[in-house]
Amino acid sequence: FADDSAVARKQIQRTLEAMGVKYVATINGREAWEELEKVADYAQASGQAVTELVSLVLTDIEMPEMDGYILTKKVKSDPRFAGVPVIMHSSLSGMSNQQLGKSVGVDEYVPKFEPQRLSETLARRLQRELPAAGQLT
């Protein structure tokens, strides 16, 4: 996942850990893209599909160096990542932000600092059980 906010990263990490999900945390879209390219190269070298190694991409919108819109556009335009959903997780919850996200290929939008909604979205996308109540706070 990509988020430049330390507070948001901690919340996302708690949510993913409560769900037993492995993750790579990055602080901006450029760093996330570099990590995704490494995974794609590894998948190709080992004869695996990227989707065996990357279940989804979770990204903030506003980040330095590369924002979530550009990251999403890169993921969605690269055939190596076909079938990898992108979830936008942001405090910019206006309809114009959501529409711009959809226009670059975002699969879902989850408002920031709503851990229950984030875990429900992730559980559905990852086909996992939800963590017990109280584990997300």
Q: Where is each model-derived feature located?
A:
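Charged docking surfaces used in two-component/phosphorelay signaling
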Residues: 10-18
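Receiver (REC) domain active-site loop signature in two-component systems and cognate sites
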Residues: 63
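Acidic catalytic/metal-coordinating carboxylates
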Residues: 28-31, 67-71
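The C-terminal output helix
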Residues: 123-137
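Active-site T/S-Asp motif of two-component receiver
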Residues: 59-60
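Acidic, metal-coordinating helix/loop segments flanking the phosphotransfer/catalytic sites
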Residues: 25-56
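Alpha4 helix (beta4-alpha4-beta5 surface) of REC/receiver domains from two-component response regulators
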Residues: 70, 92-124
